[in-house]
Amino acid sequence: MPDLSAGPVLLRSHRLDDVDDMVLACRDEQTWTWTTVPKPYEPEHAESYVNRTVGTPIDGETRWAIEVDGRFSGNIGVMLEGEARRVGEAAPVGLGRADVGYFVAPWARGRGVGTLALWLVCDWAFRKGGCEVVTWNALVGNVPSRRMVEKVGFHIHADPARRMVVQRGERVDVWTADLLPEDLVPLDTLLP
């Protein structure tokens, strides 16, 4: 799994020294409200996550830690589907899809960190993952996440997908959006 970087953002493998900041981030009310992380979020959750994800794609999903100024500042991952799972091989055009998901720690919000991380992962999915389309889903009402995907070039679907995601045992509605390679905005338009 390659490191990816732009501006102040570094995407890298998770490390055990991320655990304390991961716990802080996942105990944040906004993170809990808009994601499916367990509540309460304990150090064991973070340790298990890090141990499962260090450096290797899992079931087609590649996950990175978001780092800013040497500090863990969130998670981002892309789930490659179909032919796109053959990372490193030339996947046939038109067969690759991916879903992207992320959260940004409270201390990194409002600085464009999530937008840059999202751009890096989408660019990687198109160039290296064999993807022709990247899809995003977020719980209806998660306006900051919606703004991020719009800045990167995603097109929001008109109607929410009804009860598409399970969050802590309840089915909830989500916004959905898709990004094609030609829709990805130039990186320099996002840099500080």
Model-derived features with residue positions:
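Acyl-donor (CoA/ACP) binding surface of acyl/acetyltransferases
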Residues: 1-30, 63-192
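A short, aromatic/hydrophobic, helix- or strand-capping loop or linear motif
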Residues: 34-39, 60-66
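Conserved GNAT-fold acetyl-CoA-binding loop/helix
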Residues: 30-52
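A generic secondary-structure signal
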Residues: 52-53, 124
